Amino acid sequence: MDRRRFLLGSAVGTAALASGLGLSACSQPAAVPGAGAPGLVTLDPVIEELQERSFRWFWDTTNASNGMTPDRWPTPSFASVAAIGDALAVWPIGVERGWITRDQARERTLTTIRFLHDLKQGPEPTGVGGYKGFFYHFLDMNTGHRFGQTELSSVDTALLIGGMMFAARWFDQDHADEAEIRRLTQVIYERIEWPWLEARPNRISMGWHPESGIIEADWNVYNEGMIVLILAMGSPTHPVSKGVWDEWCSVYDKSFTDRWGPKHLHFGPMFGHQYSHMFI
């Protein structure tokens, strides 16, 4: 298997990508004495209910005709491409838990990925869903076109791709629709022009606006943007160099502080860990 195509084989696997691209870890985790493989967990009924209700939110609020998942609810909302990526990862879980059938999940997944594949892209500020393979952060729930003046987002595109890859890995049968899910996922991933957003050496920008150009802020400190770097380096068509990883790691120690007591991350929100590590 091509070292970059492995991404479809294991969602977004950091270890395999790091090995294939010659990356080094930013730091080495400390060994935990007596640590072993986790055993089976029996969940509290409250947690079970929370999980199913969370699943039902995605299933019930997503536009079944095109796969657009709203950014919020119950107020009228636009779709979030990151939320769409989450939804694509949720459908297989729903099958595994017995909440929907594989046929239902397959149909919803293919509808979504096909809609995004066919969605018009271009430099125009309106009437398109993305540009150079990237998608706008927020899309109209019905047309899939850019909502308002939202940015073309590198991280939200990456989270969408993460969900697509999870789905492409899970739908592994010979069924024609499952093969199409895998094919379209690869096409969408391969057309993203990652180097275009490397406006500054070894740094990938957070995005672009057709009105003002590339955003000045970059993914260069520890936060939810790790998945952007992994996907960009692993691209089989438009890769960036491993210098973006070296730059990321060069400020790793500065991501921590002991200013207010025990050493901790400057960037503390839970999503800073969850968003990338759902897939990595």
Task: Set out the residue ranges of the language-model regions.
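Well-ordered alpha-helical scaffold segments within catalytic/enzyme domains
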Residues: 39-43, 86-100, 115-118, 159-174, ...
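Hydrophobic core segments within long, regular secondary-structure runs in both alpha-
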Residues: 47-59, 88, 106-117, 161, ...
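N-terminal, post-signal-peptide region of Sec/Tat-exported proteins
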Residues: 70-92
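Solvent-exposed, acidic/flexible segments
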Residues: 40, 44-51, 77-84, 102-109, ...
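N-terminal export signals
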Residues: 5-27
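Helix-terminus loop motifs that line ligand-binding clefts
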Residues: 52-75, 99-149
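C-terminal segment of N-terminal export signals and the immediately downstream linker at the start
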Residues: 1, 21-51
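Extended ligand-binding clefts on enzyme/binding-domain cores
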Residues: 45-46, 125, 129-157, 173-280
